[in-house]
């Protein structure tokens, strides 16, 4: 049975790329045509890439490898947290802090601080502090939970990183390259497939497209560890809008 169908990719808008003037020529092998000034991604090739990525991820998960999911754009943030949690992986979905991987010793110190503050909150120790001090500590706790909550159980560097939007997450890509950590990435027509190890061409701006691809990768990890994956719940799209162009400017 196919990992992904052309019909579900069409329905999710996986085939819509960026405006032709904003493309990266290195994505040419994955582009089918252009319509009304917008590149259309070749879904046959996307299906092949999803199949390759699924099997690569599943094989590595079966070997006990650990994965970090990265997607900080608004359309991807909620999906990244949901799917990474479902398959027992780590995630970054707010902001990539410089040195997240290359300066892991320092970042781990902040993670340890997060755990310390959470213990203080759980045991009631925070409530015993002077009101002003407690307020400062709670603000610190909230900030650490926001940026590091998805990796608080990560004891060492991940074995592989799954990235949504290579262009936007270029800092994460550079750190992975520096450390030799394999990258699985969803790539829109403005991205560079040469800087990742396992490319998946697809619309990385539409929520349904991101959800479809990320859920397949999460399924691969879940099935490697637990057997058949449960049917994925429908993502709540309220408060998260599809965008086809705006976020590319930020990268």
From Swiss-Prot:
Keywords in alphabetical order? Ribonucleoprotein, Ribosomal protein
Task: Extract one GO BP annotation from the record.
Answer: translation
Identify the domain of life.
Bacteria
| Classification via Pfam families | Ribosomal_S2 (PF00318)
Q: Report if keyword Ribosomal protein is assigned.
A: yes
Is Ribosomal protein a UniProt keyword of this protein?
yes
- Gene name of the encoded protein: rpsB
Q: Which family does it belong to?
A: Belongs to the universal ribosomal protein uS2 family.
Q: What name goes with this protein?
A: Small ribosomal subunit protein uS2
The organism is Synechococcus elongatus (strain ATCC 33912 / PCC 7942 / FACHB-805) (Anacystis nidulans R2)
Q: Which InterPro entries match?
A: Ribosomal_uS2 (IPR001865), Ribosomal_uS2_bac/mit/plastid (IPR005706), Ribosomal_uS2_CS (IPR018130), Ribosomal_uS2_flav_dom_sf (IPR023591)
Cite a GO CC annotation. cytosolic small ribosomal subunit
This entry's Gene Ontology molecular function terms read: structural constituent of ribosome
Q: Which Gene3D superfamilies match?
A: Glucose-6-phosphate isomerase like protein, domain 1 (3.40.50.10490), Helix hairpin bin (1.10.287.610)
């Amino acid at each position: 049975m196919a990992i992904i169908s052309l019909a579900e990719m069409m329905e999710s808008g996986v085939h819509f790329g960026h405006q032709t003037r904003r493309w990266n020529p290195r994505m040419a092998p994955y582009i089918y045509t252009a319509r009304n000034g917008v590149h259309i991604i070749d879904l046959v090739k996307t299906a092949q890439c999803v199949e390759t990525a699924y099997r690569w991820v599943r094989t590595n998960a079966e070997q006990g490898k650990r994965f970090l999911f990265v997607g900080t754009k608004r359309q991807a943030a909620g999906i990244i947290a949901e799917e990474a949690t479902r398959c027992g992986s780590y995630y970054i979905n707010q902001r990539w802090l410089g040195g997240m991987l290359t300066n892991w010793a320092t970042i781990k110190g902040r993670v340890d601080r997060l755990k310390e503050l959470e213990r203080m909150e759980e045991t009631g120790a925070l409530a015993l502090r002077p009101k002003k001090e407690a307020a400062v500590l709670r603000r610190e706790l909230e900030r650490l939970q926001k940026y590091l909550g998805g990796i608080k159980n990560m004891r060492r560097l991940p074995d592989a990183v799954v990235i949504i939007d290579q262009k936007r997450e270029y800092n994460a890509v550079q750190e992975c390259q520096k450390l030799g950590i394999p990258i699985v990435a969803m790539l829109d027509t403005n991205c560079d497939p040469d800087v990742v190890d396992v490319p998946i061409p697809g619309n990385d701006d539409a929520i349904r497209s991101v959800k479809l691809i990320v859920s397949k990768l999460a399924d691969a990890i879940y099935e490697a560890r637990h057997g058949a994956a449960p049917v994925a719940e429908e993502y709540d799209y309220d408060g998260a809008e599809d965008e086809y162009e705006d976020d590319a400017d930020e990268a």
